[in-house]
Amino acid sequence: MSKEVSEEGKTHHGKDYVDPPPAPLLDMGELKSWSFYRALIAEFIATLLFLYVTVATVIGHKKQTGPCDGVGLLGIAWAFGGMIFVLVYCTAGISGGHINPAVTFGLFLARKVSLVRALGYMIAQCLGAICGVGFVKAFMKTPYNTLGGGANTVADGYSKGTALGAEIIGTFVLVYTVFSATDPKRSARDSHIPVLAPLPIGFAVFMVHLATIPITGTGINPARSFGAAVIYNNEKAWDDQWIFWVGPFLGALAAAAYHQYILRASAIKALGSFRSNATN
């Protein structure tokens, strides 16, 4: 997209931002870089902290018996959204602040990260999630074991198809927000206000939780669902686990395609470039 400025009868064409080059599909050189392993550590710790705070909030809420006790659904949604805001702000400059395999998958499809980095991030995120929920169980063992362990399952009264649809749409909202908040044009314009990228991402997580907690407990993050399932180790949590991988990955795929090929018209630009080269 070009920026046109007319001044004194002259028209100047030029971008006020630079599109980063696409990441290589397979960059084995990253395995020799300390910055790659530093990013893996950042993703591991961020996901650990995310799961610890959020699952502890869920268990603490369920532990209360009075109708006005605990933080309620609104407080749980704030815990998830608020932690994403904080952790993305803290880690964006190191790893990009993904904290979610679905986000990593979407960015990989858009050629923002290489396959090596994407796989490394997903492994680090899942391990961090397991450790984070493990800390919750260690500190709150009795309520953790009796109150669902913070695991994602399909709620009574909802079909698996409905739950899958909720996860697809919820993850679409999140990943679409990530693409929009980190768009090079927006980043160039808002670079003097560093909180403007993490804020809408955290708020998107908050809003999606309000909508989907009654259906699935809100996954939209395969690492979050996997970590809780591993530590809680409940049959229903494992039976429903596929929903919290397939749904988020399909949602991320749809968001990446929508942003890259419709909003940013990457396919049309590539076709135009091909035609231009063919005529020269």
Curated annotation (Swiss-Prot):
Induction: By NaCl and abscisic acid (ABA) treatments. Aquaporins contain two tandem repeats each containing three membrane-spanning domains and a pore-forming loop with the signature motif Asn-Pro-Ala (NPA). Pfam families: MIP. It comes from Arabidopsis thaliana (Mouse-ear cress). One of its GO terms (molecular function) is mRNA binding. It is a multi-pass membrane protein. The keyword Nucleotide-binding does not apply. This is Aquaporin PIP2-7. The modification N-acetylmethionine is found at M1. Disulfide bonds: none annotated. It is found in: Cell membrane. A motif (NPA 2) lies at residues 221-223. Interacts with SYP61 and SYP121 in trafficking vesicles and at the plasma membrane. The modification N6,N6-dimethyllysine is found at K3. InterPro entries: Aquaporin-like, Aquaporin_transptr, MIP, MIP_CS. A motif (NPA 1) lies at residues 100-102. The chain crosses the membrane at residues 39-59, 70-90, 119-139, 161-181, 193-213, 243-263. Keywords: Acetylation, Cell membrane, Membrane, Methylation, Phosphoprotein, Repeat, Transmembrane, Transmembrane helix, Transport. Water channel required to facilitate the transport of water across cell membrane. May be involved in the osmoregulation in plants under high osmotic stress such as under a high salt condition. Highly expressed in flowers, expressed at low levels in siliques, and at low level in leaves and roots. Highly levels in elongating cells in both roots and shoots. The modification Phosphothreonine is found at T279. Belongs to the MIP/aquaporin (TC 1.A.8) family. PIP (TC 1.A.8.11) subfamily. Residues 1-38, 91-118, 182-192, 264-280 are cytoplasmic. Residues 60-69, 140-160, 214-242 are extracellular. GO terms for cellular component: plasma membrane; plasmodesma; vacuole.
